[in-house]
């Protein structure tokens, strides 16, 4: 007799990593990704922008996290019927590429690059920038992320660069660009300025100890005072950058700040009154003195003598001015102004007609304008400057000052602020419009909109977009080389360049673009030449140009771009609110007056288990490929996307992969176990499951209702960009499916008759697995594919079956038959399945279950049954009473017992009690305890919290309609909770049904109950022996039990029960197939089993 097996032979201990490799091969061999795009109608699209990473390094966990999130929503929108193109992109230009090439070439600095040759250097950058592209493809593919690598865009491609040129000219024509010499964050290690937002990336601020120095400036004239006359009047200024003192040109005070006139010998020192005590030692004070006080406004306009003679004749300099940036805090209340090295300094000095001086070169070294410091790096010059100040008598105090200081995001060297020439976007001109457009964006987490991102927009500054570097898109600006005949030409296309310069442009990079020159049309002498300025674009301008750059807009694909802008969705980590998200917003607003995206997730960062940043140097993380090969990528996906990191918080992940293993064990395995159970028993019975929702069995109706609830919850969650809740819905469903539905339905699967009830059980389980495979396909794409393929597309397997008909005998669950008639429920006759029999789960449509109506009454009742059972089992565990040990009774004390009575036999069987007692007199067993939601209530009533806490402990409160009265206030439902608290003399009690009902287990064990418990233990021992002997679930066996423990009474009373449960007969004197030794009540038992 042949046994037809319709499903794969599935191992309960699956090799998930190997399984995933098979799925990846299936996708590749059948071109499933492309089919998922081609099969969708282009009229309904989900537009997704893939932020371009640098390819000159391997992907890290942050990249994988972002990739998982991108993949989830792309897959989900696909099964929702949307066409989702996923074009990958590469960020190729900028400092990361240049620094890597400098390292590999063994050169450093702009001069060294120029000597090496710009053409050769950029050629090396071009070759090295895609060094890890193949590795990226391996990692991305292995994580089951679908992207289009073949048609990827690169910011170094000529077409992309041309779109950047177009954007620049558009901004220029709109009057949104200007050139200026302004103070900016400056990386002397990279010899380039940085944007303000670049100093906010990747925790660029580091704790740093600097020497802070207090110096005295000698006033040129006396200060009007009643204190008396002094030989000198000196005003004290404090700075953490002594190296800027040689460039001092002014001092700033606060107009409304009080300044003390502090005499010491024949000198009067002027210092903010709030700072006097900090300088008591240096000024020889006892602390008892009183000083004359003047306002800062009285110091305005006073002249002082320059500290050094480098710029002593600089026009309009060495005066005291009022500055609104001078506030009480650190220092002396006096700020020294070096307009070449401070933003506030420059603004104030320019307003007073003081031109800046900047005696520091591109490498952060002093120039010949400071002869005695020439060639010295500015930070190395601090000590020499302090020594000079001491020699001159201008020094008062030096101290170590520890503060957070910005560092270069590429070299980790401390930045300086330095005046450099640059081109700027006038962001301040349209920042209010950006704030308005931001309100059209759905941010996840929500608070990012008006806080992290919104505040940044409100305080946006003009953006420096030019860099004096080499490898990047060149600024399309040509200037006359003769100031007598000034002219500026800005180009926005290759066509414009070719027209004016009369040559074919094949490469827009330096040095080729620099070679384009022509006579200045505005020079009648014909001697001056139009030459391109040397600067290239800030690479953030290029990544912000991604939406149109990838399409070569407006030169090609004009209609396509207009249909694909803005994006429906983007995602990156939270610091990109100062990076990519910001530059997208700036350029989108300036060029199109539209937000660049409509939905945006800002996820958090991944750290090691101690909270440290993941680092090769610290060796504190595992190679992701190792985790994939060990546990599979679905497990890592779930670990990350079910955590708070998707809500912008941190995720701490261990190096050994224990978290991922736990996910495999607690999330992936339960899904697989349900599938394994179905295939094993369906093959054993030669039955096929089918999508069918017409069963009237109460457990079927319940689990199908729970299925639809889960499917709807997943859909609702992913519509709201909430993977956490979606994963919870999956986990919660399989918890009920495995530990309730399958376990309570085993009798139906095990029985020998292939009747309608048995087929309904298979159909219901099949329907659950098939439907969930589709619903969760975006969340666990590979295990979903494996289950779907196994259910839908396996070939029939004809194996030789064991002789004889399956005569599995199992206990009958009569409680369900009773419940069917006791609970009203509505059942539709069929399931509407709006999808074809696709070869891949990722080509299906999301299930709607529109023809099946949830039985909410049954769900509520059955959920209470589960609650009762789980609480009862918890009490058993707490009291160390094993589940196989019967108990006399359970008392259920509730106002809603009628529905529960229909499930009495089920409750008795599940928690192993002999009787269920129903009561409704809760007041005799429990009291209600008030639990305050302190964070919630504290926001509304902070001034009454102490009073409310005292009253809650005393029980001085009253439940009223719509809330709770306490201390003259009415608490809202989310500000408190009433918890049932059993009286202290009651044992074995627990609340259920949202703290509205109570259960009490009778924990007393009689001799009869103990004896029955032993019988159940014996059944378990025999079942384990069957499993260890590798017997089939249908095999009948012989059993012999040898023990010091007297089992005769147990065998006499419970022999039939034991034989029925184990498909066995008691026998002696046979040669066993398997022998096991177990222990019962400290007695050794030997079990012998043999196939009969």
Swiss-Prot record:
A motif ('HIGH' region) lies at residues 53-63. It catalyses: tRNA(Ile) + L-isoleucine + ATP = L-isoleucyl-tRNA(Ile) + AMP + diphosphate. Signal peptide: none annotated. It holds the Pfam family DUF5915. InterPro entries: aa-tRNA-synth_I_CS, aa-tRNA-synth_Ia, Anticodon_Ile_ABEc, Ile-tRNA-ligase, Ile-tRNA-ligase_type2, M/V/L/I-tRNA-synth_anticd-bd, Rossmann-like_a/b/a_fold, tRNAsynth_Ia_anticodon-bd. Transmembrane segments: none annotated. Keywords: Aminoacyl-tRNA synthetase, ATP-binding, Cytoplasm, Ligase, Metal-binding, Nucleotide-binding, Protein biosynthesis, Zinc. NCBIfam families: ileS. This is Isoleucine--tRNA ligase.
